[in-house]
Swiss-Prot record:
Record's protein name: Probable transcriptional regulatory protein FTW_1073
Family: Belongs to the TACO1 family.
Domain of life: Bacteria
Gene Ontology terms: cellular component: cytosol
Family annotation (InterPro entries): Integrase-like_N, TACO1_YebC-like_2nd/3rd_dom, TACO1_YebC_N, Transcrip_reg_TACO1-like, Transcrip_reg_TACO1-like_dom3, YebC-like
Primary residence: cytoplasm
Annotated source species: Francisella tularensis subsp. tularensis (strain WY96-3418)
Keywords for this protein: Cytoplasm, DNA-binding, Transcription, Transcription regulation
Keyword Lyase: no
Gene Ontology molecular function terms on file: DNA binding
Presence of the UniProt keyword Chaperone in the record: no
Length: 248
């Protein structure tokens, strides 16, 4: 299990998301709508929808907005008929990157993604070129100061796969993707509110970067996340607290 803290990355990511909350909401609504269209509007029977709603609530989306997105997807609204596509590539320094998209026009999306990679010193790869480096898992992250023993007891009893305590005191709870929402709900019921919770692609081996390369990789990821069709971007870059502070 990779033992790299997500805490520094979370703080940096939240600062960026606060500056572009409207676009984040658009992506979250799209995920809820597609999840409801593919698996139905009952979140108890649809793990993907349950996870999407949990993420939306964590980002302070109103329940009314969430409900409208669920109804839109479950009702078969034609505008909800987008397809999911995944692109893989390499960033500066050979950093592995996965880009998950939802689109109604593959040609437009792949063109935008390829252009962004190329202009940022990377290159778009073929299917499977980097995916083997990642494992899909749920990660529930807690800030320094949480009661480690109590959290560990509750998380393990709820079915967590692993719990990592980092040098800065932050804690990551790892789950099977299918158990993610159930474990998150148990933790919340027991009073453990996380700083971040997501089903993500986690790299077993992280790429260590110097400051210059890290800045270029972070810029590429930011540009990819700004594309309208892009839902999520994953990389194996190890953005340490020191690197993030140096980059600013």
């Amino acid at each position: 299990m990779a033992g790299h803290s997500k805490w520094a990355n979370i703080k940096h990511k939240k600062a960026k998301e606060d500056a572009k909350r409207g676009k984040i909401f658009t992506k979250l609504i799209r995920e809820i709508t597609v999840a409801a269209r593919l698996g139905g509007g009952d979140k108890d029977a649809n793990p993907r929808l349950r996870a999407a709603i949990a993420t939306a609530l964590a980002n302070n989306m109103s329940k009314d907005t969430i409900e409208r997105a669920v109804v839109k997807g479950a009702g078969g609204d034609e505008s909800a008929n987008v397809e999911e596509v995944r692109y893989e590539g390499y960033g500066p320094g050979g950093v592995a990157i996965i880009v998950d998209c939802m689109t109604d026009n593959r040609n437009r999306t792949v063109g935008e993604v390829r252009h962004t990679f190329t202009k940022s010193g990377g290159n778009l790869g073929t299917d499977g070129s980097v995916a083997y480096m990642f494992t899909k898992r749920g990660i529930i992250s807690f800030a320094p100061g949480v009661d480690e023993d109590a959290l560990m007891e509750v998380a393990l009893e709820a079915g967590a796969e692993d719990i990592i305590t980092h040098e800065d005191g932050s804690i990551d709870v790892y789950t099977d993707p299918h158990d993610f929402s159930d474990i998150q709900e148990v933790l919340i019921e027991k009073g453990f509110n996380s700083e971040n919770a997501e089903v993500t692609f986690d790299a077993e081996t992280k790429a260590e970067l110097d400051t210059e390369t890290a800045e270029k990789v972070m810029a590429l990821i930011d540009k990819l996340e700004d594309l309208d069709d892009v839902q999520s971007v994953y990389s194996n870059a190890n953005f340490t607290q020191e690197l993030i502070e140096q980059i600013g």
